[in-house]
Amino acid sequence: MKLTVWTYEGPPHVGAMRVATGMTGLHYVLHAPQGDTYADLLFTMIERRDHRPPVSYTTFQARDLGSDTAHLFKDSCRDAYERFKPEAIIVGASCTAELIQDDPGGLAETMGLPIPVIALELPSYQRKENFGCDETFFQIVRALAKPVEKTARVSCNILGPTGLGFRHRDDVEELTGLLSEMGVDVNVVAPMRSSPSDIARLGAAHFNVMLYPETCEAACRHLERAFQQPYTKTVPIGVGATRDFIAEVQGLTGVTGAPDENRLRLPWWSASVDSTYLTGKRVFLFGDATHVKASARIARDEMGFEVVGLGCYNREFARDIRKLAKEFGLEALITDDYLEVEKAIEEAAPEMILGTQMERHIGKRLGIPCAVISAPVHVQDFPARYSPQVGFEGANVIFDTWIHPLVMGLEEHLLAMFREDFEFHDAAGPSHHGGHAPKPMHDAPAASAAAGAEASMAEETAAPSQDAPAATGGDVTVWLADAEKELKKIPFFVRGKAKRNTEKYALEQGVTEISVDTLYEAKAHYAR
């Protein structure tokens, strides 16, 4: 464990909360101290749920540790059953409570409650939130699913959506409609929108849709072994992936129906005149493995972007992401440290970031546009509107989401054309903010024509750019006016990197004044 201001995943008991919160008729009794009782905040504030999560806590305090805390857990279990009358209870310990080793599962089994009690073994110090989702759902399915007769019509279970998931609510709706157009009924959606009695009839479906491997792959594998239910391997995010998914379902079931593509707009929108400016845009992707894999395909094959970096934070899928990165000629970034991600983004100098809420903050710091493609996300990414990621409508939503942060072709050409204008030059704030806009911080202001090279040098010496490396000893590197002017001709998205490389080269060569020649020598040096 480590102290950090940001984490991509919480401890595994948060994953168990997500499963329990998505379901009805299930209650989660969590052996936890006062400080671990934050489920209400997570689900009612961030996800805007209109009801509290079904979680009860033992809420032991420091003074309780000198005595037996097992009775606190038993009392909490009994109170939860009598108050909420659930169909089943899951029990476990938080990361802190795990240290006192009270064995909540064993304690609950001795109580003789008249409902199924499912014990969770979630190693808080080895695994994280997505594992908690996957393992919790697997244990629920293993305990409750029973052999039942198959449905008369071809049907499936949609598995994986949970509470606090990125667009899970709308993805379920979109996918249900897509399957309906194919002639496939949905038997159960789980864990979200299901109850323990629904879990019991999972076996009635002919196959399972593995919508989010992070949260349901173990359950899908179990159902395949126990009930001979095959499951889909393609996640239908993006046009190509959705078509592959349709073909996979047709192959599994023999159905010939296909959904209507008339409402699909991404292919034409991305081929339209203004969108040709998207071609070659350099993007960096980071998030959970499922959304990164899907987004990488969309970025390259459907939007015409150039992927310059990709990675994921969930190490369980590191092998898949490394394999994908090789196909793109890249080295995958597998880390849960946001500082490593920020460093990689800064070095890659992309024109756009596709990531999580943390990458949105990184983008703001670095001045790079960002679109959110993956959990963890904040409250603004649980929209009131219908906004799926899967299926054909999901592809339309993705197109809109990704291009909105970008400066489109004509707009950027106009900005370049009027770069020297008194109102639009680099030292002026955005015109729509009037005179109150702050001056940009990423580049030093250009010296005026009258001041000439000497004023520019003095200004740079007195207030060096934040991009410049710290001078050592008496070495001070300054930009001559003509070099500074030439630097501004470099596209803004790589200008910072070019400036840093030039200054580094100048320091290595002992050059104290950067001229146009120095700029191009540095370019040639780093191009080797």
UniProtKB/Swiss-Prot annotation:
Catalytic activity: chlorophyllide a + oxidized 2[4Fe-4S]-[ferredoxin] + 2 ADP + 2 phosphate = protochlorophyllide a + reduced 2[4Fe-4S]-[ferredoxin] + 2 ATP + 2 H2O
Name of the protein in question: Light-independent protochlorophyllide reductase subunit B
Organism whose genome encodes this protein: Dinoroseobacter shibae (strain DSM 16493 / NCIMB 14021 / DFL 12)
Upper taxonomic lineage: Bacteria, Pseudomonadati, Pseudomonadota, Alphaproteobacteria, Rhodobacterales
Residues at the catalytic site: D274 (proton donor)
InterPro entries, A to Z: ChlB/BchB/BchZ, LI-POR_suB-like_C, Nase/OxRdtase_comp1, P-CP_red_C, Protochl_reductB, Protochlorophyllide_Rdtase
Subunit structure: Protochlorophyllide reductase is composed of three subunits; BchL, BchN and BchB. Forms a heterotetramer of two BchB and two BchN subunits.
EC number from the UniProt entry: 1.3.7.7
GO biological process, one term: light-independent bacteriochlorophyll biosynthetic process
Gene name for this UniProt entry: bchB
UniProt keyword terms in alphabetical order: 4Fe-4S, ATP-binding, Bacteriochlorophyll biosynthesis, Chlorophyll biosynthesis, Iron, Iron-sulfur, Metal-binding, Nucleotide-binding, Oxidoreductase, Photosynthesis
Binding-site residues, [4Fe-4S] cluster: D36
Residue numbers binding substrate: G409, L410
Cofactor annotation remark: Binds 1 [4Fe-4S] cluster per heterodimer. The cluster is bound at the heterodimer interface by residues from both subunits.
Biased segments, Low complexity type: 444-465
Pfam family, one: PCP_red
Region (Disordered): 429-471
PANTHER family, sorted: LIGHT-INDEPENDENT PROTOCHLOROPHYLLIDE REDUCTASE SUBUNIT B (PTHR33712:SF7)
Function: Component of the dark-operative protochlorophyllide reductase (DPOR) that uses Mg-ATP and reduced ferredoxin to reduce ring D of protochlorophyllide (Pchlide) to form chlorophyllide a (Chlide). This reaction is light-independent. The NB-protein (BchN-BchB) is the catalytic component of the complex.
Pathway in which the depicted protein is active: Porphyrin-containing compound metabolism; bacteriochlorophyll biosynthesis (light-independent)
Family affiliation: Belongs to the ChlB/BchB/BchZ family.
